[in-house]
């Protein structure tokens, strides 16, 4: 039950962000959005290294000099999986004027919802893999580091929920429907987390591949979505500073508590 509640934390971030439509007339400030994106990116990069790639390699030590192979394969499968989704699904990233994927007549807001949903899939899977590794007794993955990852993703999801719900409200939707639209964009996260957790427990020998798959998918999201978000608009170092803060927090927890 405790694991399930922790898996729901990222979804809570989306829900709270979507609720901004009830008490805010303007979106979150640029500096706030950059800070949150930078912090989340730092957490995810550190998790990719210490929580996923290094444990994946260590669990494959019986392969000798080829112990890197499961991590290498899993990482590339994760990257290619996200690249494939990016090509197949029409979507529009925050702050971008050019839609990606196949041509579509979908509205701008709908494609923004799809962009958020698209990248929520690997985030949910990453959380599921993290808790699967912890429950499997992986010494490199602690309850604290898994919780920090959930919190880091929740922090990143907060502005995304607002980014979806507030434009829907501006287009004439009721506050309730706008809130629901933001919430629905994050529903795939707990679903993906639970399914991945169950799958990983059924195929423990495949855990190194699943861990590195999560790393590849998350690194793709960081480079494709979070780095542009923390760098857009007027020049500021705030995103970079919070990236370092997020990275340091996750690294410290992983190493100190691992």
Give a label for each model feature.
Residues 1-258:
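Intrinsically disordered, metal-sensing/regulatory segments
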